[in-house]
Amino acid sequence: PIETTGQHAGVLIAKMGNEGIILTTEAAIESADSIEVALADGTVLEGAVKQRDTVADMAVVSIDLSTLSQEQRDKLPVIELGNSYSVKQGDLVVAVGSPAGVIHSTDYGVISYVVRNVQLVDGVGRVFYTSVNGAAREGTFLINLNGQLIGWVTEAYANAQNSGMAAVAGVSDYKAVLEDLSNGVAPPYFGIRGQEVSREQVEAGMPAGIYVVESVSDGPAYNAGIQNGDIITSIGEASVATMKEFQNQLDLLSSGDRVRVMVQRNGTDMYRELEFTVEIRGR
């Protein structure tokens, strides 16, 4: 067999007792038989996959801090998670990790523009575009001038219109996911991109709920029979009319749960109500 190796960057986001929690990209652990984590002082520790999120291309790796001296542990800083909702156009940012495509590289620049209410899988969020170089697979993390993590470069939102700019996922949209990953829990996966039916659309005759822009192929919703154009009106016993309500209900579920989902589907001349059972998976 041919042995292959790769190098990826990560950031230490928490210390829990003797365990260090490192955020990195899913590509960093993809098909890995073993993981080594090199600290800034050159110390190399064995890493273990805590959990991954293939939808958001994130992974958490843990390291055993008990093998370090007290001095080393004291000098190992945890990066603070910032508030990406406060990021605005023109803000100065620093990229660390692998912005040049190799680890230990850095870059700096500005936030060129902010896109709000971007349709994410199972939610909505903010995406920043920046002049900073960014290698998504190798791991590029953006920090503000207070030294706080505000996001990471992703390939999920790159397109021809913003060619030459790096797309950045804001950390605040993923804090609940990071908490799950850090605790070894797979975040719940429903598998849609959706948007709220507006008041004007309801007044025009559409049912209130979440309009399914995309039922992600081979996702739980797709496999249950939910289609593009369906309007989700309830999950379990709770009505959902906003993406926040949808996310709140999804957060109550775990991988393996089976939940009843009520949908309005547009027919030739009217909407009809359908019931589906969706089996939640881990992301």
Task: Please place each PLM-identified region on the residue numbering.
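C-terminal cap/linker of serine protease catalytic domains
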Residues: 145, 149-205, 270-271, 282-283
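Catalytic-histidine neighborhood of serine endopeptidases
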Residues: 17-59, 63-66, 75
